């Protein structure tokens, strides 16, 4: 991972771009009691078109916000409830340009991080849940 140092504010960050195109940033805070994780995608409320494998698709207005809520659905139940049951405070938002999912917790950080990364990378949609 590339290390960046921000001397002016006494911070350091580690950054790496993964093979799938995602950029991972880590800000170590060993003196903090609470952990915080944030996952964002460059798809927000203003986005009504996307390209996948060279094919452009139009989507209805509001689909980013709709997906923000639907992404918490999992095969096993609901990731929002799973995170809360682990003592985390989860939330999500859709801005004009991005959709973000995050949580903060004082315990079970790694387990909560696995839940977050799982539901954003393995969406679970059924016809019943979409109707």
Where are these regions (language model features)?
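His/Glu-rich zincin catalytic helix
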Residues: 1-79
């Amino acid at each position: 991972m590339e290390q960046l140092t921000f001397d002016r504010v006494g911070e350091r960050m580690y950054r790496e771009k993964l093979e799938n195109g995602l950029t991972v940033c880590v800000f170590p805070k060993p003196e903090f009691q609470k952990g915080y994780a944030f996952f964002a995608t460059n798809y927000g409320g203003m986005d009504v078109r996307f390209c996948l494998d060279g094919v452009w698709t139009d989507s209805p207005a509001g689909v980013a916000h709709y997906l923000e809520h639907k992404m918490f659905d999992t095969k096993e139940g609901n990731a929002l409830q799973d995170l809360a049951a682990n003592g985390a405070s989860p939330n999500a938002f859709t801005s004009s340009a991005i959709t973000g999912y995050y949580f903060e917790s004082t315990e079970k950080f790694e387990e909560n991080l696995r839940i977050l990364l799982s539901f954003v990378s393995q969406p679970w949609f059924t016809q019943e849940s979409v109707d």
